[in-house]
A protein has these predicted regions:
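HIT superfamily nucleotide-processing domains
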Residues: 1-142
């Protein structure tokens, strides 16, 4: 298994070297919006621990990420009027992983509405800012 790359974009976000549309943060995790969302409200949850993917993360960090994923999923559904939610997590290149820091996708869904293709179109910053504000407010209220 490959080693953790300190230069990955999520590590840079955690260090404050790259901006992100943050919606939730605690001592062990960070949640923010995907800048190329497959649907409005598409969020990502990452551990603050250095973990390439699910294969090398400490069990307690994985458990915490999943607890936060559930919290974000509930808020995403309520905030964006979703009827369901898709949770995705990829491991290694052959498994579809592109950014090599463990992350979980939370994609709100509505019946009959197709998702945009992955990494297809960058959302406008003002739209992401508004979505982040709404989702962060919903998470604060819970």
């Amino acid at each position: 298994m490959a080693t953790y790359d300190e230069g990955n974009i999520f590590a840079k976000i955690l260090r404050g070297e790259m901006p992100a549309y943050k919606v939730y943060e605690d001592e062990k995790s960070l949640a923010f919006l995907d800048i190329m969302p497959r649907a409005p409200g598409h969020a990502l949850v990452i551990p603050k621990a250095k973990a390439r993917n699910i294969l090398d993360v400490a069990p307690e960090d994985l458990c915490h990420v999943m607890q936060v994923t559930q919290k974000i999923a509930r808020a995403v559904m309520k905030t964006f009027g979703a009827e369901g939610v898709t949770i995705q997590q990829f491991n290694e290149s052959a498994g579809g992983q592109v950014v090599f820091h463990l992350h979980v996708h939370i994609v709100p869904r509505k019946a009959g509405v197709a998702l945009k293709p992955p990494a297809s179109e960058r959302e406008k910053p003002e739209v992401l800012a508004e979505h982040a504000k709404r989702l962060a407010a919903a998470l604060t209220a819970t």
